[in-house]
Amino acid sequence: MKTKLITRAGYNKLKQELDYLWKEQRPEITQKVSWAASLGDRSENADYTYNKRLLRQIDRRVRFLSKLLPELKIVDYSPQQEGKVFFGAWVEIENEAGEVKKFRIVGPEEIYGDAKDYISIDSPMARALLKKQVDEEFQVHTPTGIKEWFINSIEYEKGEL
């Protein structure tokens, strides 16, 4: 089961997407569908077929976001989080081979598009990191075995209010 937590920035991004789809893109595509339908024969009308398909995709995403947003719980930064890994943290870790990774722990709904440096709170890596501190070692169970990592830094975005 997916965790229904989200950062304020992630929530705002999803809300902006919903507003854009509903208030701008959907009316524009609806107008194109109406125009294409007015041309007559719809069976061989590529504009009509394409825009009708696009309208269905928009409607599907609007329904998904409209149902999802009220279910999400926004987690804001709290000063008590400083020094430990919690939801919303940017964490830099390193393994014995010197491989360094930096990512942010977020809700599963925030991981889409260009969010390649985000990991889900539900992932094994995030679960292993929770409540750990800088300079602490931790283990992650992976399909190829247990991996050991070291925490270099923990940061929070404090301006997300």
UniProtKB/Swiss-Prot annotation:
Which Pfam family, an example, fits this chain? GreA_GreB_N
Would you kindly state one Gene Ontology biological process term found in this protein's UniProt entry? DNA-templated transcription elongation
Signal peptide start and end residues: none
A single GO molecular function, which one? RNA polymerase binding
Sorted alphabetically, the keyword list is: DNA-binding, Transcription, Transcription regulation
Which protein family is named in the record? Answer: Belongs to the GreA/GreB family. GreB subfamily.
Q: What does this protein do?
A: Necessary for efficient RNA polymerase transcription elongation past template-encoded arresting sites. The arresting sites in DNA have the property of trapping a certain fraction of elongating RNA polymerases that pass through, resulting in locked ternary complexes. Cleavage of the nascent transcript by cleavage factors such as GreA or GreB allows the resumption of elongation from the new 3'terminus. GreB releases sequences of up to 9 nucleotides in length.
- Output this protein's name: Transcription elongation factor GreB
